[in-house]
Swiss-Prot record:
This is Polyadenylate-binding protein-interacting protein 1. Residues 433-442 have a biased composition (Acidic residues). It is found in: Cytoplasm. Interacts with the RRM1-RRM2 and C-terminal regions of epabp. The gene is paip1. GO terms for biological process: regulation of translational initiation. Residues 1-86, 420-442 are annotated as: Disordered. It comes from the Eukaryota. GO terms for cellular component: cytoplasm. The keyword Cytoplasm applies.
Length: 463
């Protein structure tokens, strides 16, 4: 009967140390012995009398009718569940299969009600857009101004992220900016950021160009580019008064002038046939702004004019030449008169003279030759004239033209190329440390930028 009984894993192993050993000596099979449990009582009493030990904990779910444990047998007789009426081997298998599942359920600390997990560095506030109807992301009501301002501040700190983040930004605006008031507010935010933060003028102009071509909204009156030019027109009409104003007014006016120059270079207008042109109104506006700056020849006005011409001079002159206009000649003439007559500082006069030299050199542009043909021994008779001459161990000179020494010549030439940057005395000929460079002084524009940088650094330290 015991041969056909399947013992559950682990059951009876602990009892084999005491009672199971004596049953083996008595000729009985260790472990469960079928339905007879009375024969184990003498052995149990003898083991308890010879050695006092803590009774073993009964299993949570023991097999019914087991003769090894009287307490477990008594408990099993009291149960009335259907499992108690199953065969012994079936119930034992059920116990052995249920134990790993119970153990895993007790050790697990996972919960379906746990809070949502976010990786480190993930910002929930920066991703507060939600999808609506599977189309464009939408912002919660009343947060458009904060969203746009945060994005502008982010571009100011990280202008390199423009290409990656401007597309989702325009998607949000396409779904949120639906009225003339919200569009006007968007234009004003970008304009104020461009003239209040000097380093944002270029990025702001790029952003204006992108939005003017990709902001697909249909307001009742005007689009983004029209409202932007209208806002610039309002500031443009104050040019003479601003050029004569105090230092703060002139500083704001100069920021507007440079932003308008960036707009002229970056704002693209697509024609009816798909051609891309620049805004003509900005071209004429820059000419008027230069006249206002030269009409009030104080140092900061003249320096602003120099910066504007360095930025847009070559493009303006090319555009005026296409129309057969001599506007750049008039600008240069006014600049020379300022150098001769105005009571500006010596550094500013030096900046103006250098700008005249820059324009005389075609604004520093170098046009490559239209045709280029690589020199070879067949098409260039002077091909071997600039090649070095080597000598054999016998003192016989040879060059690349000698066919008997071509292999040896190439080997020596490669060795010379390996030490190309070193002179005969062992020093590095290409190292600027050994060169006498007297032109290490900063020009006035660089000095001004450096002073501004130092002042901004001190201001940030005090905050």
């Amino acid at each position: 009967m015991s041969d056909g009984f399947e013992r559950a894993p682990g059951v009876g192993r602990g009892r084999g140390r005491g009672r199971g050993i004596e049953t083996a000596e008595g000729g009985k099979t260790p472990g469960f012995s079928g339905a007879s449990g009375a024969g184990d009582e003498p052995g149990r009493a003898k083991a308890a009398g010879s050695q006092q030990q803590e009774p073993l904990r009964p299993p949570r779910t023991g097999p019914p009718g087991g003769g090894g444990d009287a307490g477990a047998a008594q408990t099993s007789h009291k149960r009335t569940s259907p499992a108690a009426q199953l065969p012994a081997h079936t119930y034992t298998m059920a116990v052995s299969k249920a134990q790993p599942a119970d153990r895993g359920r007790l050790l697990s600390n996972l919960s379906a009600n746990a809070a949502e997990f976010y990786p480190s560095g993930y910002s929930v506030e920066a991703n507060n857009c939600v999808e609506e109807n599977g189309c464009y992301p939408v912002l919660p009501e009343g947060t458009l101004t904060e969203y746009v301002q945060d994005f502008l501040n982010h571009l100011t700190e990280q202008p390199g992220s423009f290409e990656a983040e401007v597309f989702p930004f325009s998607d949000v605006l396409n779904n949120c900016v639906t009225t003339d008031e919200s569009l006007q507010e968007l234009v004003e935010l970008i304009y104020q950021q461009a003239i209040s933060v000097p380093n944002f003028s270029y990025t702001g102009a790029r952003l204006c160009n992108y939005l003017s071509n990709n902001l697909h909204i249909n307001p009742q009156n005007q689009n983004f580019r029209q409202l932007l030019l209208k806002r610039c027109q309002t500031e443009f009409e104050k040019r003479d008064q601003a050029a004569k104003g105090d230092g703060a007014a002139r500083k704001q006016f100069h920021a507007f002038v440079l932003f308008l120059g960036e707009l002229y270079l970056n704002l693209e207008i697509k024609g009816a046939k798909g051609q891309v042109t620049r805004a003509e109104i900005l071209q004429s506006g820059l000419q008027e702004l230069l006249n206002s700056l030269f009409s009030n020849p104080v140092d900061d006005n003249l320096m602003c004019a120099v910066k504007l011409l360095k930025l847009t001079g070559s493009v303006l002159e090319d555009a005026w030449k296409e129309k057969a206009l001599s506007c750049m000649e008039e600008v240069m003439l006014r600049m020379k008169n300022v150098v001769l007559d105005a009571n500006c500082s010596r550094d500013v006069k030096q900046m103006l003279l250098k700008l005249v030299e820059l324009r005389s050199s075609n604004w520093g542009r170098v046009h490559a030759a239209s045709t280029f043909k690589e020199a070879t021994p067949e098409n260039d008779p002077n091909y071997f004239m600039n090649e070095p001459t080597f000598y054999t161990s016998e003192g016989v000179p040879f060059t690349a033209a000698d066919p008997d020494y071509q292999e040896k010549y190439q080997e020596l030439l490669d060795r010379e190329d390996f030490f190309r940057d070193y002179d005969e005395n062992g020093t590095d000929g290409g190292d600027s440390y050994f060169e006498d460079d007297d032109d290490n002084e900063m020009d006035p524009e660089m000095e001004e930028a450096y002073e501004k940088f130092c002042l901004e650094s001190e201001h940030k330290k005090k905050q």
